[in-house]
Amino acid sequence: MPGLTIGDTVPNLELDSTHGKIRIHDYVGNGYVILFSHPGDFTPVCTTELAAMANYAKEFEKRGVKLLGISCDDVQSHKEWTKDIEAYKPGSKVTYPIMADPDRSAIKQLNMVDPDEKDAQGQLPSRTLHIVGPDKVVKLSFLYPSCTGRNMDEVVRAVDSLLTAAKHKVATPANWKPGECVVIAPGVSDEEAKKMFPQGFETADLPSKKGYLRFTKV
């Protein structure tokens, strides 16, 4: 069966964490959560990633988005490793919880397993990141191999896109950033678009003359 992906409800797992017991649905509450895995504590790329998450925590907080990490190491390991993360990026504080999944059952349910990375206990997590909405449904997923660290600017951009799309019923084009034009969904007629977007919209003049590429500001 395919693993957890966009449109699926995230499992309501309860795990130990650096902040005590966490039940995922309770943690999500009525907001958005970035649920992300890392292959292992005390490893180089993971240290830079979780430090970057700490640096960007305020950006996510401003958007009403919480962070929640997970790996197969135990809670005590997470706590000890946090000292290294904060020393690597002075001034950064790891304020978000990191869950422990020593038996690796949670990462399987969350579709966070890297089939190519293993240790003596079994398969390790990939660098997976799910953005979970208030309805507990996965809205977006990133999946990176162990050799490639994630780009936090792109994670922020993706969050901004999801929040904008949800609020204004639009979509965002390639390389979009907040303040730039968005596109109107194909299922919205021109008449509906005039009511939805009284500020107006522009239709790209394309060879097909189909009028499907419409831009507006929100």
Swiss-Prot record:
GO terms for biological process: cell redox homeostasis. Its EC number is 1.11.1.24. Belongs to the peroxiredoxin family. Prx6 subfamily. This is 1-Cys peroxiredoxin PER1. The active site is a conserved redox-active cysteine residue, the peroxidatic cysteine (C(P)), which makes the nucleophilic attack on the peroxide substrate. The peroxide oxidizes the C(P)-SH to cysteine sulfenic acid (C(P)-SOH), which then reacts with another cysteine residue, the resolving cysteine (C(R)), to form a disulfide bridge. The disulfide is subsequently reduced by an appropriate electron donor to complete the catalytic cycle. In this 1-Cys peroxiredoxin, no C(R) is present and C(P) instead forms a disulfide with a cysteine from another protein or with a small thiol molecule. Residues 4-164 form the Thioredoxin domain. The lineage of its organism: Eukaryota, Viridiplantae, Streptophyta, Embryophyta, Tracheophyta. The gene is PER1. PROSITE patterns: THIOREDOXIN_2. One of its GO terms (molecular function) is thioredoxin-dependent peroxiredoxin activity. Keywords: Antioxidant, Cytoplasm, Nucleus, Oxidoreductase, Peroxidase, Redox-active center. Thiol-specific peroxidase that catalyzes the reduction of hydrogen peroxide and organic hydroperoxides to water and alcohols, respectively. Seems to contribute to the inhibition of germination during stress. Its main location: nucleus. The keyword Metal-binding does not apply.
